[in-house]
Amino acid sequence: MPSKQVGWWTMSEHTNDEVQPTALSGNDAVNRAAEQWKESAHRNIPGLGDLPIPDDTANLREGPNLHDGLLALLPLVGVWRGTGHADTAEEGQYAFGQQITFAHDGENYLTYESRIWKLDDEGNSTDLDYRESGFWRISLKDEIEVVLTHSTGVAEIFYGEPMNERAWQIESASTMVTAQGPATLGPGKRLYGLMPNNNLGWVDERMVDGEMRPRMSAELSRVIG
């Protein structure tokens, strides 16, 4: 795997070296995030503004206040964009571009959307790969629940927990594939974490022949929030 990509072992090394969680008030957590990402502070995802309920926001400075129950997921909120590497049973190895959006509307969950497109050897987009959408929740006991659907015909439920205040690991409890979906997709786990440069790294591992193997990984920089 190219050195610029984020392997499972690399992510684990980075995140385990981070400072363990400390108690933060809601204001302290928001202020810390605001200081780290000044360059993307002026941008937000579009909203029509004419609904009787709050529009989604991916910028903690705009829209409704983040629900207090989501403070452990606060660093994820924003739009992230970058490149990654895939090694799948269906299509082999390839490079991809990706955009991930974590947004909220003031309620006690985050909305999640991922768009992935294939890249050629020169880094140019060649084809849309697939999309994911879903919701992230976390309990008062720091138990994470994630519900995801894939445009390829997959629905998954993940459970997990924060590893520290900058990393979150989830494992699939249920993976359902439609008749036209990727029949070889097995159960898996994911790790999302902020790297020392404050980029978001993530990796997806899947069960293949009785062992977990990296399937997709990427390093993304914040462009909104």
Swiss-Prot record:
Q: What SUPFAM superfamilies does this protein's entry cite?
A: Lipocalins
**Pfam families (alphabetical):** THAP4_heme-bd
Residue positions of motif GXWXGXG: 78-84
The record's PANTHER family line, in alphabetical order, gives: PEROXYNITRITE ISOMERASE THAP4 (PTHR15854:SF4), THAP4 PROTEIN (PTHR15854)
Family designation? Belongs to the nitrobindin family.
The entry's protein name is: Ferric nitrobindin-like protein
Q: What is the lineage of its organism?
A: Bacteria, Bacillati, Actinomycetota, Actinomycetes, Mycobacteriales
